[in-house]
Amino acid sequence: VTCFCRRRGCASRERHIGYCRFGNTIYRLCCRR
C-alpha cells in the first residue's frame, strides 16, 4: 500500500483515509493499493 499526503483531492485510484497536518496546512492522506 502506498500513501501520499495531498493538498488537493485524491486520485481516482486512491482512497481518502485520513488527514496529515504540517503546521497550519491540512493535507488529505490518500492510499493506493
Swiss-Prot record:
It is found in: Secreted. Its main location: secreted. Belongs to the alpha-defensin family. Disulfide bonds join 3-31, 5-20, 10-30. This is Neutrophil defensin 1. Anti-fungal and bactericidal activity, greater against Gram-positive bacteria. Pfam families: Defensin_1. SMART domains: DEFSN. Keywords: Antibiotic, Antimicrobial, Defensin, Disulfide bond, Fungicide, Secreted. InterPro entries: Alpha-defensin_C, Beta/alpha-defensin_C. GO terms for cellular component: extracellular region. The keyword Iron-sulfur does not apply. One of its GO terms (biological process) is defense response to bacterium. It comes from Mesocricetus auratus. It comes from the Eukaryota.
